[in-house]
């Protein structure tokens, strides 16, 4: 994949931190079925815990912003509760409560440091979601990209994604009305092989032209992501 051409739009202390961390990390392999990434795009990817988002942060070639749950952006107390009650017991599927409580508590300061550096766009399950969309549109207008992990992880992170939450289609539809026909890249991180498989991008207008509903578009792209996960 092409080297980064842009100065990362992150705070100086975070850029320094990631530059140091990258010295100890192995670069992932990127496999493209079509064109490589471009500016002002929408990227959908599986989550795979914390390793996938951080690997993207280190090596993605263009400026972008992540979407993330609002509970992780509302202070240490909210973050700690989310780690203890959702991330470890539900997303990571830890069975015992005590380790979830201890690791969630001890991990909050480090996680807060990371989230402050990532500058995540918070997302919501209610009317406040439209504020997330508006903020994302402002980012796209700067020729930056949005990276989303839309998988339904209510039963934990899984290799075979059960479904995509369709919120990203609201963003894509709003962007189209604003004159931005976003190329959508579906991407799958294969953790054991430390590589990203990236499907050929498809414009949102092409998906709409098929007469599909937002749920049908979401289902199609979820299946595309699962297909990439089986890539040999």
Question: Model-derived features: where do they sit?
Answer:
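A generic local structural motif
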Residues: 27-32, 52-53, 108, 133-134
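Catalytic core of membrane glycerolipid acyltransferases/transacylases, capturing the structured
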Residues: 38-125
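Short aromatic/hydrophobic-glycine micro-motifs
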Residues: 25-26, 119-120, 230
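Non-catalytic C-terminal accessory region of glycerolipid acyltransferases
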Residues: 2-4, 125-232
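A short, well-structured juxtamembrane/interface segment
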Residues: 12-40
């Amino acid at each position: 994949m092409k080297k980064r051409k842009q100065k990362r739009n992150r705070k100086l202390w975070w850029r320094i931190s990631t530059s140091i961390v990258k010295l100890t990390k192995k670069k992932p392999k990127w496999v493209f079925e079509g064109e490589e990434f471009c500016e002002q795009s929408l990227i959908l990817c599986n989550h795979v815990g914390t390793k996938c988002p951080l690997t993207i942060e280190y090596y993605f070639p263009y400026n972008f912003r992540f979407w993330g749950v609002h509970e992780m952006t509302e202070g240490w107390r909210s973050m700690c509760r989310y780690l203890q009650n959702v991330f470890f017991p539900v997303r990571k599927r830890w069975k015992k409560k005590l380790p979830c409580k201890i690791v969630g508590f001890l991990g909050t300061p480090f996680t807060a440091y990371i989230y402050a550096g990532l500058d995540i766009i918070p997302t919501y399950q209610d009317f406040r979601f439209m504020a997330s969309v508006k903020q994302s549109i402002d980012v796209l207008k700067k020729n930056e990209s949005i990276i989303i992990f839309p998988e339904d992880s209510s039963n934990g992170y899984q290799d075979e994604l059960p479904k995509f939450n369709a919120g990203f289609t609201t963003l894509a539809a709003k962007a189209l009305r604003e004159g931005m026909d976003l190329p959508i890249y579906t991407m799958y991180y294969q953790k054991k092989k430390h590589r990203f498989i990236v499907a050929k991008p498809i414009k949102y207008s092409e998906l709409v032209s098929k007469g599909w509903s937002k749920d049908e578009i979401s289902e199609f792209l979820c299946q595309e992501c699962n297909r990439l996960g089986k890539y040999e």
